[in-house]
Amino acid sequence: MEMKKSGLGTTAIHAGTLKNLYGTLAMPIYQTSTFIFDSAEQGGRRFALEEAGYIYTRLGNPTTTVLENKIAALEEGEAGIAMSSGMGAISSTLWTVLKAGDHVVTDKTLYGCTFALMNHGLTRFGVEVTFVDTSNLEEVKNAMKKNTRVVYLETPANPNLKIVDLEALSKIAHTNPNTLVIVDNTFATPYMQKPLKLGVDIVVHSATKYLNGHGDVIAGLVVTRQELADQIRFVGLKDMTGAVLGPQEAYYIIRGLKTFEIRMERHCKNARTIVDFLNKHPKVEKVYYPGLETHSGYEIAKKQMKDFGAMISFELKGGFEAGKTLLNNLKLCSLAVSLGDTETLIQHPASMTHSPYTKEEREAAGITDGLVRLSVGLENVEDIIADLEQGLEKI
């Protein structure tokens, strides 16, 4: 079902839908591990990839196929692959395209587990990793080598919301024809930016976050061109990680996507109001948000993003101790990691999501001990602000 000319909300609801035997409106959950062949010959043809069809849910399942079709349509890519987590998506992709002797250029500022994979995981298997500030294109250019296979980054970056010019970076990376640019689009989602349209080769997501949107699923997604997607499915996913998404979880994300556009509108609208509140508050030292004209990446964000997102990071006067006081006194906002849920979530990156970093590595990445990260939810914005206000009063 071709939906690329439809609006984003229509695409999220209708794209990739498969007809089924009973004509159900909701996508059925095909809760099966394996699929029956009509004959031995058919089984042989499917294993030889001479005939389309399902074999085993680790390789594909009708429910997950619909989700894969939807994310491919939303990102305007050729093919999607569903995984059991965001880290499963990242690991399966990297284990497909990398080998010993390859070189990776990545950013100093990454989600903590991604940083650990880059810093401690890949290097154990003979992959060289160089950490730079990817928003500084000269640093990227200077880090490139003949054996650079991957340039990997997030934008906006977790947790300080650094912005990278994807179009300019992709042009630099592709001066080496063997280099792939991989972008984690979890924070922005295809609601705000479509990296593949800006020259990026592969997009990865933690679908746990905004795409599902309800805090009840762990999942990851990859979108890229068909040939590369097939390699990731049949090498990285099938053989290297086995990070398979179950049909039940795929169903939840399919359902969550039906409200994707309207949820993102509310998330972003709430965030803009809260940024204005925090930016004027006397106990707040600094607010990090791409929609602020004072943000170093504001002009780039305005160019490549439809909106500025619903993630806010800020530092309080009084540093970490002030931050702990705030976190421990909130009533409505939930003290929890993750993001993109209907509930507003708040956490302390240095001691939580980014604890794999040493203090020196955090400082180099711009993750201070006093930084607080806020994932703005869908509650009435005046209630979120009232809770933040009473928490700040305790400092």
Where is each model-derived feature located?
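Conserved PLP-enzyme active-site core in the AAT-like
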Residues: 3-4, 12-21, 79-283, 288, ...
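N-terminal "arm"/small-domain region of PLP-dependent enzymes with the aminotransferase-like
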Residues: 1-61, 69
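PLP-dependent enzyme catalytic core of the Aspartate aminotransferase-like
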Residues: 119, 128, 142, 146-149, ...
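Short amphipathic alpha-helical segments
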Residues: 52, 78, 218, 249, ...
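Glycine-rich beta-alpha junction loops
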Residues: 17, 31-37, 187, 239, ...
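Conserved N-terminal alpha-helix of the aminotransferase class I/II PLP-enzyme fold
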Residues: 39-91, 116-120
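A common structural junction motif
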Residues: 240-241, 330-338, 391-395
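Conserved C-terminal alpha-helix-loop-beta "cap" of PLP-dependent enzymes
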Residues: 284-372, 376
